[in-house]
Amino acid sequence: MNLSLPLHAYLLVAFGSGLGGAARLWVSTLVSRGTGTAFPWGTLAVNVAGCLIVGIMAALFEPASPLHVRQDLRVLLVVGLLGGFTTFSAFSLETLLLIQRGAVAAATAYVVASVALGLLAASAAYMSMAAALR
């Protein structure tokens, strides 16, 4: 199986990721200015917005969609833009697809494992780095 992609696909992802990352910073900062930083409202807003957008895009980009969206546009917007904006959108879409396929147990395990392992990784990395900096 050949998994190589053409150079333009990588360039589309890079461009979209840059825009998505800048958008994430802007939205998160804007929300945090209005709500404060005691709770990560900015990040929550970005993650929920990303999930909303990926849901819309997934529906629009379905093979049965009358739009007939090119693969390049999907790569730019979903992998690049939303990948830069938030990877939580991909996580949510993957969970939704598992549920739609009837794999509710797998979807549940994926959610629990993603959250638990994400928190564990963040905690371990934070504590390790804090200890190394002392």
Regions found by a protein language model. Name each.
Residues M1-R134:
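Membrane-interface helix-loop junctions in multi-pass transporters/channels
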